[in-house]
Curated annotation (Swiss-Prot):
It comes from Pyrobaculum calidifontis (strain DSM 21063 / JCM 11548 / VA1). GO terms for molecular function: magnesium ion binding; phosphoenolpyruvate carboxylase activity. Homotetramer. NCBIfam families: PEPCase_arch. The keyword Magnesium applies. This is Phosphoenolpyruvate carboxylase. It catalyses: oxaloacetate + phosphate = phosphoenolpyruvate + hydrogencarbonate. Catalyzes the irreversible beta-carboxylation of phosphoenolpyruvate (PEP) to form oxaloacetate (OAA), a four-carbon dicarboxylic acid source for the tricarboxylic acid cycle. Its cofactor is Mg(2+). It holds the Pfam family PEPcase_2. The lineage of its organism: Archaea, Thermoproteota, Thermoprotei, Thermoproteales, Thermoproteaceae. It comes from the Archaea. Its EC number is 4.1.1.31. Belongs to the PEPCase type 2 family. GO terms for biological process: carbon fixation; oxaloacetate metabolic process; tricarboxylic acid cycle.
Length: 459
């Protein structure tokens, strides 16, 4: 089958609670109603049953869906460097077992790829590839079933790792014949670590240089963009922003369809997003200049220094954000943010994003002080050339900025910078009265859900 274009995921970015027991039927609906040709069963920091890929196979067989031909299941593993080793091995086993049953009952391979998240080194990637190869060989030798080759997709989720894509891919695939490989670029975790500006520039730069990587390594790279609804997480699933984001992040082949765009917006709005993503696929993009690299470094440093000032407050609010999937708590599996000599355990991206919105200051606006510096040094035009949708993203998020609430939860310094930036850009910094009313109510789980329903995404 051809490489998929729309990957349905199990992200907890919706205000609607979806249990693991409901995810098998959800996968079938993704194939049949939402037009996704790929469903990602997720084990990263998530208590997904190891039988789930097999259950999707059996449900698809019963429904007479052409799994393995038109539709495919992709499994996201835990990274054995970050979670328990046995969880990664059990997730690999779940992928191979799914193929055992799909070959046995349908004569096709349902799983052609697994995703390894948080890739930062070649060794972990090589380990997973070796273990997967052994499992496949064991099934062929002992069960007499050829479950086929399953490829490992590296997921780069850090701005500086993405900028090293050429070196990492060269190590992983050196000596292999020319073929198509899939590369997953994640926006969300990179934004948590480095801020919106740095993470957006890193992905845009990386996408613009993949042609060089293909030529030098003899590969055909098919990029996957992992992005959600808010601008901080890429905005590619946002009905208002998607037609512009596909231009900003041109060069992708596949895009994620996360939960909020399926559960928190009307079907006709989802269809607009789907159409924009499909129409924007594979468009060429201009080569980003090397000057971007210095801005990525500076923006990341400024962002991390700023977030450290407010980390305790954001963590306090984050504890109120409900989980709408059966994920492991972020206190057990979160993200590490380093600023100076301080290291802070932060929530994962969706909870983190939701918490910032609940303070009255959307996280894209944390770059405001640095953006003012860029404007004064005549470098803002370079950013806007590489990120043509950036001003629209700021304009969008200023609708959820409330000065009084942000001053209450944070302080006047960051609020002043946001207001000054909005004035400089000629944008209005004022929320809808209904949303402002919700922001000024006491924070609790119900209030955070209500804020998310208004925005049409939790985080």
């Amino acid at each position: 089958m051809p490489i998929p274009r729309l990957m349905c995921t199990q992200h907890p970015d919706t205000t609607v609670k979806i249990t693991a027991a409901e995810e098998v039927d959800e996968a079938i609906v993704a194939f049949t109603a939402y037009g996704c040709d790929e469903v990602m069963v997720d084990y990263e920091g998530k208590a997904t049953p190891y039988s789930q890929p097999k259950e999707v196979v059996m449900k698809a067989a019963k429904s007479e869906l052409p799994l393995g031909e038109k539709f495919v299941i992709t499994v996201r593993l835990p990274n054995p460097r970050l979670e328990e080793f046995d969880r990664a091995m059990l997730a690999l086993e779940a992928a191979v077992v799914a193929n055992y049953f799909s070959v046995k009952y349908m004569g096709v391979r349902a799983v052609k790829w697994v995703v390894l998240p948080m890739v930062e080194d070649v060794e972990t990637m090589s380990l997973v590839r070796r273990m997967l190869k052994r499992k496949v060989e064991d099934y062929k030798a002992e069960a007499k079933v050829d479950v086929g080759n399953i490829e490992v997709i590296p997921l780069f989720e850090d701005a500086f790792v993405q900028l090293k894509a050429k070196a990492l891919l060269g190590e992983v695939f050196k000596g292999e014949e020319v073929r198509e490989v899939r590369l997953f670029l994640g926006k969300s975790d990179s934004a948590v670590k480095h801020g919106h500006l740095a993470s957006a520039l890193a992905i845009a730069y990386t996408l613009s240089r993949l042609g060089d990587v293909e030529s030098e390594l003899g590969l055909r790279i098919r990029p996957i963009l992992g992005m959600g609804s808010p601008p901080f997480r890429g905005g590619l699933n946002n009905p208002r922003l998607a037609p512009m984001e596909v231009v900003q992040y041109a060069g992708y082949y596949t895009a994620t369809i996360q939960s909020a765009v399926r559960y928190d917006v009307a079907l006709e709005e989802f269809l607009k997003v789907r159409e924009a993503i499909l129409n924007g696929c594979c468009a060429p993009r201009q080569r980003a200049p090397d000057e971007v690299l210095h801005i990525v470094q500076e923006a990341s440093a400024r962002y991390r220094a700023l977030v450290m000032k407010y980390a305790d407050k954001v963590i306090e609010v984050a504890r109120l954000v409900p989980s709408t999937r059966d994920r492991v708590s972020w206190t057990a599996y979160g993200r590490t943010l380093t600023g100076g000599e301080r290291v802070v355990n932060m929530p994962r991206a969706i909870v983190y994003t939701s918490a910032w919105y609940a303070t009255g200051l959307p996280p894209t606006l944390l770059d405001a002080p640095y953006l003012l510096e860029l404007a004064k040094s005549d470098k803002l035009d370079l950013v806007l050339k590489v990120l043509p949708t950036y001003l629209k993203e700021l304009e969008y998020d200023l609708e959820f900025f409330d000065r009084a609430t942000a001053e209450k939860y944070l302080d006047g310094e960051i609020v002043k910078a946001v207001v000054e930036l909005a004035d400089y850009l000629g944008l209005e910094a004022r929320p809808n009265p209904a949303y402002a009313t919700l922001l000024r109510m006491p924070r609790n789980e119900a209030n955070i859900i209500a804020l998310g329903k208004y925005r049409k995404f939790l985080g």
